[in-house]
């Protein structure tokens, strides 16, 4: 199944954040899932991992590039995101990227941030029950 993974899920996995890492691992390591991220998430992950260290930053980028299909963050996606009515433009870009990639779901811990999304958002727990 094609799913776009929100950055919070990737960080749960990479940082082994309890109690969320277990569900993240089940989703990210399931070969039945085709994983997508928006291109801007790669640089954001690098930035956020600075608190852990330089090696972790590189490992995060390598993990994403190896395990995910990157949805280009082009003018079409950025323009589409502006029309979605999201309070947070970055979340709108994620939703527009999921739509462009024809993903079935966005997997996130912040489901309410995607209330206006053209692609349904599920929490990891919800996704694991389908």
Language-model segments: residues:
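Short, flexible helix/strand-to-coil boundary loops that buttress conserved ligand/catalytic motifs
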Residues: 14, 85, 118
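Short, well-structured N-terminal submotif of metal-dependent ribonuclease cores
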Residues: 1-36, 51-59, 130
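A generic structural signal for short hydrophobic patches within well-formed alpha-helices
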Residues: 10, 42, 78, 114, ...
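Acidic, PIN/NYN-like endoribonuclease modules and their adjacent C-terminal/linker elements
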Residues: 2, 67, 100-130
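Short beta-strand scaffold positions
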Residues: 5, 36-37, 72, 108
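Helix-adjacent hinge/juxtasegments
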Residues: 50-55, 64, 68-71
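Active-site neighborhoods of divalent-metal-dependent phosphate/nucleic-acid chemistry enzymes
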Residues: 69-111
């Amino acid at each position: 199944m094609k799913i776009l993974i929100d950055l919070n899920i990737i960080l749960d996995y990479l940082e082994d954040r309890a109690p969320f890492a277990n569900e993240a691992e089940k989703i990210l390591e399931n070969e039945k899932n085709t994983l997508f991220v928006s291109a801007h998430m790669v640089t954001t992950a690098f930035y956020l991992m600075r608190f852990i260290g330089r090696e972790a930053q590189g490992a995060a980028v390598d993990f994403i590039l190896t395990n995910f299909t990157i949805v280009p963050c082009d003018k079409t996606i950025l323009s589409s995101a502006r029309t979605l009515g999201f309070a947070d433009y970055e979340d709108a870009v994620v939703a527009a990227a999921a739509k462009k990639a024809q993903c079935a779901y966005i997997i996130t811990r912040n489901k309410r941030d995607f209330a206006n999304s053209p692609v349904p958002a599920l929490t990891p727990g919800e996704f694991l029950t389908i």
